[in-house]
Design a protein with these regions (language model features):
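Charge-dense, helix-prone N-terminal extensions
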Residues: 1-103
């Protein structure tokens, strides 16, 4: 069976042209984002999530962003949805990705 085309994933990858270490792999019905061997992001159901710690998660919560929910019963508080304004600004998105990949 041919893989399903994912326009959102393609958009996200295009936005990361300033991050040469970026690779991605299909996983859990979405895609995992890596910088080298470091797993730092998730593309799932038309949303982008970055790895966060206690300090950086505050920045996401202040913008009313939610943690990653792979299903109705599970919440991963170590990954938060990236705000749309950041997603649309390739330079800012790269900075946020670099921070997420350094955690």
């Amino acid at each position: 069976m041919a893989p399903k085309h994912d326009g959102f994933k393609d958009f996200v990858l295009d936005q990361f042209s300033g991050l040469p270490c970026l690779t991605h792999r299909a996983m859990f019905g979405g895609y995992g984002l890596y910088c080298g061997s470091v797993f730092f992001g998730i593309v799932h159901k038309g949303r982008l999530y970055f790895k966060a710690n206690e300090t950086t998660a505050r920045r996401y919560r202040e913008r009313k962003m939610k943690p990653y929910r792979p299903n109705a019963t599970q919440i991963l508080h170590s990954y938060y949805e990236v705000p749309v304004d950041i997603l649309e600004d390739a330079g800012e998105l790269t900075l946020w990705a670099q921070q997420a990949s350094s955690l």
